[in-house]
């Protein structure tokens, strides 16, 4: 579809009581403006013009990688003035879609309907009917067709009774829009250039104005304060949870589940309460996720159990694995099939072989660990000397006793045994027992120190 988009994002957001621009506050882990940008990109917008004002440096630092044209509105003189800053970029014959960076939930379906509804030479306008329209511009109709929009502060008492309100989202042709914007005046209670005045201008020219309703009213709710943002967050999460339930995912309590990215699921998935999904997560068949887990950018294969309060980021977990409770898998962690990682174990940049176990109180970093290895409680791969990192290599069928330190770089051969409490600084051969302990010393009739 041949259209360009303008996203208005210049507002300061005073009621957020924040040092950053309002549209950078996140919903589902993503800046509100990014939600709107993604909607435009999903529909194939030819150009996306982002109109910014306050906090320009922060805006570009956060959204600088996006495919947008940056348009500065140095003075905030109204919505019409804001769109007009981008108007030199409009092609005369293209559709121009106007959206808002603080209205993050607008859907592709609603935008498609709006684009399709634009009459030739006219305007398609997104409206909604509210029980309490206080604060919004009212839609003025004459015998059916829309003829104008009147803002709350300029409305008569009779007009204030109207419940159909303007969302601000609209579509017009670029050439017409440029002409109407250039003719705007600021003769109103706010002293601003209202975008909504182009509706009356179009009507005066005999152009049709087509009103379209959103798929869901929540889509057009804006954010002015943190309470409104929290409300939209819950609405968004409820919708995501409902989709997963309909796809066969068992959410034990849909109201206590947060999806802040994308989730690909197999069959018979079970997710307990207070689980957070971030980035891109893939779950195979029959995966169970315990309460309080955080999963980010990870893949978990079939028949694996993630026990409560585990944090998994940038990791790959094979089939029939058990993780947790209270496990941390960091980027580069790879658990092969039937591996087990237990409570208070941290794993980073490690391949843990098939059937291997590290069940208690262990740090494994920068290591290659073979099959059927048993890593005892309190084992540490000492991978960092204060300047550089080094690798530990452990062969198949190795037993590493509790409270051992493996000082990298070091290699432990297949079938070797490391006695509990050992510090390993040199390579250990296959099937070798390595043990290093200080000689025990005993003092009879020992007297403990007493307080003075």
Curated annotation (Swiss-Prot):
Q: Which InterPro entries match?
A: Bifunctional_GlmU, GlmU-like, GlmU_C_LbH, Hexapep, Hexapep_transf_CS, MobA-like_NTP_Trfase, Nucleotide-diphossugar_trans, Trimer_LpxA-like_sf
Q: What class of enzyme is it?
A: transferase
Cofactor(s) listed in the protein's UniProt record: Mg(2+)
Q: In which pathway does it act?
A: Nucleotide-sugar biosynthesis; UDP-N-acetyl-alpha-D-glucosamine biosynthesis; N-acetyl-alpha-D-glucosamine 1-phosphate from alpha-D-glucosamine 6-phosphate (route II): step 2/2; Nucleotide-sugar biosynthesis; UDP-N-acetyl-alpha-D-glucosamine biosynthesis; UDP-N-acetyl-alpha-D-glucosamine from N-acetyl-alpha-D-glucosamine 1-phosphate: step 1/1; Bacterial outer membrane biogenesis; LPS lipid A biosynthesis
Q: Which UniProt keywords apply?
A: Acyltransferase, Cell shape, Cell wall biogenesis/degradation, Cytoplasm, Magnesium, Metal-binding, Multifunctional enzyme, Nucleotidyltransferase, Peptidoglycan synthesis, Repeat, Transferase
GO CC annotation: cytoplasm; membrane
Catalytic positions are 360
Q: Where is this region: Pyrophosphorylase?
A: 1-226
Disulfide bonds, paired cysteine numbers: none
Sites where the protein binds Mg(2+): 102, 224
Q: Which CDD domains match?
A: GT2_GlmU_N_bac, LbH_GlmU_C
UniProt binding sites for UDP-N-acetyl-alpha-D-glucosamine: 8-11, 22, 73, 78-79, 100-102, 137, 151, 166, 224, 330, 348, 363, 374
Pfam families assigned: Hexapep (PF00132), Hexapep_2 (PF14602), NTP_transf_3 (PF12804)
Extract the ranges annotated as region (N-acetyltransferase). 248-452
Annotated binding of acetyl-CoA, by residue = 377, 383-384, 402, 420, 437
What Gene3D superfamilies does its record include? Hexapeptide repeat proteins, Spore Coat Polysaccharide Biosynthesis Protein SpsA, Chain A
User: Which EC number(s) does the record attach to this protein?
Assistant: 2.7.7.23, 2.3.1.157
Its domain of life reads Bacteria
A GO molecular function annotation here is:
UDP-N-acetylglucosamine diphosphorylase activity
Protein family? In the N-terminal section; belongs to the N-acetylglucosamine-1-phosphate uridyltransferase family. In the C-terminal section; belongs to the transferase hexapeptide repeat family.
Q: Output the NCBIfam families linked to this UniProt entry.
A: glmU, PRK09451.1
The record, for HAMAP family, names: GlmU
Q: How does it assemble?
A: Homotrimer.
Main role?
Answer: Catalyzes the last two sequential reactions in the de novo biosynthetic pathway for UDP-N-acetylglucosamine (UDP-GlcNAc). The C-terminal domain catalyzes the transfer of acetyl group from acetyl coenzyme A to glucosamine-1-phosphate (GlcN-1-P) to produce N-acetylglucosamine-1-phosphate (GlcNAc-1-P), which is converted into UDP-GlcNAc by the transfer of uridine 5-monophosphate (from uridine 5-triphosphate), a reaction catalyzed by the N-terminal domain.
- For this entry, the protein name equals Bifunctional protein GlmU
Q: Which organism is it from?
A: Aliivibrio salmonicida (strain LFI1238)
Q: Which gene specifies this protein's sequence? A: glmU
């Amino acid at each position: 579809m041949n259209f360009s988009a303008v996203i208005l994002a210049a507002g300061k957001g005073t009621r957020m009581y924040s040092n950053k621009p309002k549209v950078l506050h996140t919903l589902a882990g993503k800046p509100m403006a990014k939600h709107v940008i993604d909607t435009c990109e999903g529909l194939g917008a030819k150009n996306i013009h982002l109109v910014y004002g306050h906090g320009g440096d922060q805006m570009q630092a956060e959204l600088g990688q996006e495919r947008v044209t940056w348009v500065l509105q140095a003075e905030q003189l109204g919505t019409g003035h804001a769109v007009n800053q981008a108007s030199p970029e409009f092609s005369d014959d293209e559709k121009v879609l106007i959206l808002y960076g603080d209205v993050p939930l607008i859907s592709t379906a609603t935008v498609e309907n709006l684009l399709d509804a634009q009459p030739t030479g006219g305007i398609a306008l997104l409206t909604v009917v509210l029980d309490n329209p206080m604060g919004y511009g009212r839609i003025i109709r004459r015998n059916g067709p829309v003829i104008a929009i009147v803002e709350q502060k300029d409305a008569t008492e009779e007009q204030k009774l109207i419940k159909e309100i303007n969302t601000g989202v609209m579509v017009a042709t670029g050439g017409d829009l440029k002409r109407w914007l250039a003719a705007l005046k600021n003769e109103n209670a706010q002293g601003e250039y209202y975008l909504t005045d182009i509706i009356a201008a179009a009507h005066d020219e005999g152009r049709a104005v087509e009103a379209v309703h959103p798929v869901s009213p929540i889509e057009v709710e804006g954010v002015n304060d943190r309470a409104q943002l929290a409300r939209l967050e819950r609405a968004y999460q409820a919708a995501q949870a409902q989709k997963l339930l309909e796809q066969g995912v068992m959410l034990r309590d849909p109201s206590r589940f947060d999806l802040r990215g994308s989730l690909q699921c197999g069959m018979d998935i079970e997710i307990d309460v207070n689980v957070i999904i971030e980035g891109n997560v893939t779950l195979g068949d029959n995966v169970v996720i315990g309460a309080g887990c955080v999963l980010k950018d990870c893949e978990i294969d079939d028949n694996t159990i993630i026990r409560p309060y585990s944090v998994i980021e940038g990791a790959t977990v094979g089939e029939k694995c058990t993780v947790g409770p209270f496990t941390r898998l960091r980027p580069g962690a790879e658990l092969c099939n039937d591996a087990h990682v237990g409570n208070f174990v941290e794993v980073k940049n490690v391949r843990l072989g098939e059937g291997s176990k590290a069940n208690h109180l262990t740090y494994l970093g920068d290591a290659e660990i073979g099959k059927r290895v048993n890593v005892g409680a309190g084992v540490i791969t000492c991978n960092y000397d204060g300047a550089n990192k080094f690798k530990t290599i452990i062969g198949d069928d190795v037993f590493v006793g509790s409270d051992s330190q493996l000082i990298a770089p070091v290699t432990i051969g297949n079938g070797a045994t490391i006695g509990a409490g050992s510090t390993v600084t040199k390579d250990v051969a296959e099937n070798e027992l390595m043990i290093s302990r200080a000689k025990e010393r005993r003092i009879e009739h020992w007297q403990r120190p007493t307080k003075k």
